[in-house]
C-alpha cells in the first residue's frame, strides 16, 4: 500500500472544493414558479378519433400536448413527434386540411400579418438562418406549414405564428413518410 502524504495545502483545497459544491448545485436549480418545456412523454392517439378513413395517411397536430401524430395509409406505422406550436390561440387555426405541396430547402417569406407587425422583415433563402429549417410541407390553408427548424429551443414551446415545427431530422423523416394529399387535423 502506498503512503499518502497529505499536506495542509491538500487538506484546505479539499475542504474548499467541498464548500463550493452546494453553491454550484443551487445555481442549477429552477425557480419554483418556472414551467416545463420540451416535454418528453406523449399520449398515443387513435386515428379513428379524428378521421373516418386513413386515405393517404393522417396527421394530427395537437397544440395542447405540443405533439404531431402520424399514421401511414395502411395504419401499420404510427409515430409521434414533439413540435413547436403557435404562440396564441388567435394564431392557431383549427380544423381539417391536407398537405398540398412539399419542399426540400424551402425559402421563407413573412406573411402579410407579420409584415404589419415587423415591416423590416425580409424573405430568407434556404440555409441555417431560415426559420423553416430543411423541409416544409404546405397545408391547404395559406401560410400554414409543417416544417423543420434550426432553432431546437423552439420545440416543445409556443413559438410560432401558426405553423408546427419539428426538429430537422424529424421533419426529414416525416417528409419521406407523408405524401401530398395526407390528411391533417389541427386540434
Describe each PLM feature range.
Residues 1-18:
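N-terminal secretory signal peptides and thylakoid transit peptides that target proteins
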Amino acid at each position: 500500500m502506498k503512503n499518502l502524504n497529505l499536506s495542509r495545502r491538500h487538506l484546505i483545497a479539499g475542504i474548499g472544493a467541498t464548500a463550493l459544491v452546494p453553491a454550484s448545485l443551487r445555481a442549477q436549480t429552477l425557480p419554483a414558479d418556472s414551467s416545463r418545456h420540451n416535454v418528453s412523454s406523449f399520449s398515443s392517439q387513435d386515428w379513428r378519433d379524428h378521421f373516418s378513413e386513413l386515405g393517404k395517411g393522417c396527421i394530427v397536430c395537437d397544440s395542447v400536448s405540443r405533439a404531431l401524430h402520424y399514421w401511414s395509409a395502411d395504419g401499420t406505422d404510427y409515430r409521434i413527434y414533439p413540435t413547436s406550436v403557435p404562440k396564441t390561440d388567435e394564431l392557431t387555426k383549427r380544423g381539417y386540411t391536407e398537405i398540398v405541396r412539399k419542399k426540400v430547402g424551402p425559402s421563407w417569406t413573412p406573411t402579410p400579418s407579420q409584415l404589419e407587425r415587423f415591416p423590416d422583415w425580409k424573405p430568407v433563402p434556404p440555409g441555417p438562418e431560415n426559420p423553416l429549417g430543411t423541409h416544409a410541407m404546405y397545408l391547404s390553408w395559406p401560410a400554414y406549414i409543417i416544417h423543420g427548424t434550426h432553432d431546437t429551443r423552439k420545440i416543445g414551446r409556443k413559438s410560432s405564428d401558426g405553423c408546427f415545427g419539428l426538429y430537422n431530422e424529424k421533419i426529414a423523416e416525416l417528409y419521406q413518410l407523408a405524401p401530398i394529399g395526407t390528411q391533417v387535423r389541427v386540434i
